[in-house]
Amino acid sequence: MQKSLIFILVLFLSACGSDDSPPEDIIPEEKMAVLIADVHVIEARLSKISLMSLDSATIIVERLKMDNFKKNKVDSAQYNRSYKFYSTHPDYLERIYKNVIKNLEKRFKKKDYRGL
């Protein structure tokens, strides 16, 4: 009985192990870093507008994100799948955010806060 339990446990644990490489439909790290940087710029720009209601700001942020995704030939579902994948793989996410920071630093030096 104990051998069967150990065998089942080993089988289960080996089945849980997954390939950590991104699936084909996931946005590549470099492009994801640009998209995330754009999203941060969009959100930061709108957080400065205090005259707007929260609902209005949310609608505008979502619209600007959709425009940005369209410009980069990405849809929101693919972005969300990619973000979910990367957020569950800390090594990838750390590399992406290092690139996000570099991207934002370059924009700051150029005073290019548009993001779009």
Describe each model-derived feature in a short phrase.
Residues 2-8:
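Sec-dependent signal peptide recognition
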Residues 36:
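Conserved active-site segments centered on acidic
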Residues 39-43:
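N-terminal alpha-helical signal peptides/signal-anchor transmembrane segments
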Residues 17-30:
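Bacterial Sec signal peptide processing site at the extreme N-terminus
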Residues 51-116:
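Compact alpha-helical subdomains of small soluble proteins
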Residues 12-15:
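C-terminal motif of bacterial Sec signal peptides marking the signal peptidase cleavage site
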Residues 33:
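Hydrophobic/aromatic beta-strand elements that line small-molecule binding cavities or substrate pockets
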Residues 27, 48-53:
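A ubiquitous short alpha-helical element
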